[in-house]
Amino acid sequence: MARSTKKGPFIDGHLMKKVLAAKEAGDKKPIKTWSRRSVIFPEFIGLTINVHNGRQFIPVFITENHVGYKLGEFAPTRTFKGHKGSVQKKVG
């Protein structure tokens, strides 16, 4: 179910502080976060955010097309290696 529009988008406070500090300083160093649930705001454009996927941090460079999505959408947590296929036995 989608979030109610009257509540507005969600962002963790500590992440917003880090983003604003990086924008003020003009720092291009990646921001490390575990907050996959935070919505991407226009202030994030041009920054690289390392999003944790449960095992490692995935770098996500934020562009205008990312605004409105959640950070977790760009760091997949599951790897699909394919279904087990029929194994061909060698004859001979």
Curated annotation (Swiss-Prot):
GO molecular function annotation: rRNA binding; structural constituent of ribosome
UniProt keyword list: Ribonucleoprotein, Ribosomal protein, RNA-binding, rRNA-binding
Organism domain of life: Bacteria
Gene Ontology biological process: ribosomal small subunit assembly; translation
Coiled-coil positions: none
GO CC annotations, alphabetized: cytoplasm; small ribosomal subunit
InterPro entries registered for this protein in UniProt: Ribosomal_uS19 (IPR002222), Ribosomal_uS19_bac-type (IPR005732), Ribosomal_uS19_CS (IPR020934), Ribosomal_uS19_SF (IPR023575)
Role of this protein: Protein S19 forms a complex with S13 that binds strongly to the 16S ribosomal RNA.
Family: Belongs to the universal ribosomal protein uS19 family.
UniProt protein name: Small ribosomal subunit protein uS19
Annotated source species: Sulfurovum sp. (strain NBC37-1)
Gene: rpsS
